[in-house]
């Protein structure tokens, strides 16, 4: 049994994960690898969690789509308020909310995605019942085998950043059908400015990061992968990311330039570096994505 497995087995007899997306799946895979039992829930069966009591709750069920949040800010706010209610009412000795560095006070004040998640964090820490046993882990841009939609994944796969609705296409009249719809206009190269700079985190270290969070006395944490920070001075531009992955592409985006440097040094937030055995440029990741 590894030290990490022993730590979790000794400290936590019952673990609950909320969310089956990239982060929740990565946590579940790590626990499976260490042969540690857990329960996992999502929106389809979340009501069942209230019948149980856990030693550790890892809540990764907040919608991670910035695109949809910024285009539907009211709906997204209601989603975050619902997440607060769920988080509050789950019975657990220790609770960790998986959040985002977009929630930093020093970053993107106009973003509904960041503002709504900051609201969620604020409500948790203003709640006396939650403050004592709750911690927040803010993650940056992610990479790893469970990631299925972000700049890294789309750049490697050449995947569409949004999916055109079939009903919408069906409404195009016959006269318009003679024109070719260039789907590259909906690709990640259109939506991400090549000069935007991101901090990155490898999800294969997520359980080790959570272990560090549970053992520390801070309340809010931000983490990035040490290797990527060391190579890039904390941040990597999207253009550099593409080139390091071995691709030569022509960027066609004039989207807003985002630089996450300020978000990493938010006031009263503990910044952690996590060393991974892999990096985002490994050939094995390209194979996983084939």
Where do the PLM segments sit?
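Conserved catalytic-site region of short-chain dehydrogenase/reductase
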Residues: 97-108, 112, 142-147
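NAD(P)H-binding glycine-rich loop region in Rossmannoid oxidoreductase-like domains
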Residues: 46-92, 100-108
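NAD(P)-dependent short-chain dehydrogenase/reductase
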Residues: 125-198, 205
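Active-site helix of classical SDR
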Residues: 116
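Conserved N-terminal Rossmann-fold NAD(P)-binding element of oxidoreductases
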Residues: 17-19
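Mid/C-terminal beta-alpha module of Rossmann-like enzyme folds, strongest
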Residues: 201-261, 266, 285-289
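N-terminal Rossmann-fold NAD(P) dinucleotide-binding loop
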Residues: 24-25
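Active-site beta-alpha turn of Rossmann-fold NAD(P)-dependent dehydrogenases/reductases
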Residues: 61, 96-100, 138-140, 224
């Amino acid at each position: 049994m590894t030290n990490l497995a022993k730590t979790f087995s000794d400290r936590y007899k019952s673990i609950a994960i909320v969310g089956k997306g990239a982060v929740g799946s990565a946590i579940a895979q790590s626990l499976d690898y260490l042969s540690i039992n857990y329960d996992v829930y999502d929106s389809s069966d979340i009501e069942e969690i209230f019948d149980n009591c856990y030693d550790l709750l890892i809540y990764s069920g907040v919608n991670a789509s910035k695109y949809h949040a910024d285009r539907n800010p009211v709906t997204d706010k209601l989603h975050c308020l619902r997440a607060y209610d769920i988080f509050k009412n789950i019975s657990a000795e220790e609770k960790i909310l998986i959040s985002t560095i977009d929630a930093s006070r020093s970053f993107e004040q106009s973003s509904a995605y960041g503002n709504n998640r900051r609201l969620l964090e604020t409500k948790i820490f203003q709640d006396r019942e939650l403050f004592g046993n709750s911690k927040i882990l803010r993650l940056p841009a992610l990479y790893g085998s469970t990631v299925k939609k972000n700049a890294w994944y789309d750049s490697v796969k050449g995947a569409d950043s949004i999916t055109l609705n079939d009903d919408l296409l069906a409404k195009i009249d016959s006269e318009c059908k003679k024109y070719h719809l260039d789907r590259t206009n909906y690709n990640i190269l259109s939506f991400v400015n090549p000069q935007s700079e991101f901090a990155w985190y490898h999800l294969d270290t997520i359980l080790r990061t959570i272990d560090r969070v549970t053992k520390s006395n801070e309340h809010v944490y931000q983490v990035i992968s040490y290797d990527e920070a060391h190579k890039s001075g904390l941040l990597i531009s999207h253009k550099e990311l593409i080139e390091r992955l071995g691709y030569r592409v022509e960027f066609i985006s004039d989207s807003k330039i985002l630089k996450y440097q300020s978000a990493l040094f938010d006031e009263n937030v503990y910044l952690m570096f996590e060393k991974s055995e892999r990096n985002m440029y490994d050939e094995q990741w390209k194979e996983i994505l084939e």
